Amino acid sequence: MAHRSSGSAVARAQAGDEEAFRTLWRDLNPRLVRYLRVLAGDDAEDLAAQTWEAVIGGLDRFQGDDDGFAGWVFTIARHRHLDGRRRAARRPHELGGDYRLELLAAGDDPGAEAVNRIGTEDALRLIGMLAPDQAEVVALRTLGGLEVAEVAAIVGKRPGTVRVLSHRGLRRLAEALEATRLFDSEV
């Protein structure tokens, strides 16, 4: 059976093809949940479900190809997360929970290798040390697998700014890993 592209899957899903929508979900949801784990921790699955509900509700209005679809879904997820943070800021809450981070393979991105060489708990700790804008950009690039232009559209920054944030964030992660490696070799 020939594999159909996500672009054609988007058009078929918009026409009501449930199997096409399932294909889109299977292809994109794991990356979406990984990104949301960085932003929302234990609430990532719930936030992903809310995102997909919004996607279903707005699918008929989406215009674009498969790459645009992924960016659109991540934008919806980010907006859902920010809306939740705004609501939470209006009421007292307690932070906590055991946050897990599942990492995607870095592919050809050498900077992302730093993120992938470490375990879940260490990755979360190190990404948590980054400035919030660096952490989000690093998460979208390495965990979401998105291109610079897509990340720029999602976070509302210029592509050059996204490149700088990504580079600085990944450099800080690599430096932290190197410091850890030196410390471990001295012990």
Identify the residue ranges that each predicted region occupies:
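Internal acidic/polar
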Residues: A2-S6, R91-T120
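Short, charged helix-capping/linker segments at alpha-helix termini
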Residues: Q14-R22, V33-Q50
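Amphipathic alpha-helical segment used for protein-protein interaction
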Residues: A15-E18, A106-L140, G144-I154, E175
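Amphipathic, Lys/Arg- and hydrophobic-enriched alpha-helical face
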Residues: L24-D42, G58, I127, A179
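Core residues of bacterial helix-turn-helix
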Residues: W25, A48, V55, R141-G144, ...
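Arg/Lys-rich amphipathic alpha helix in sigma70-family domain 2
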Residues: V38, G57-G64, T75-G96, N116, ...
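Structural recognition of an alpha-helix C-terminal capping motif at a helix-to-coil junction
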Residues: D46-E53, D67-H79
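DNA-recognition helix of helix-turn-helix
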Residues: R78, L82, Q134, L143, ...
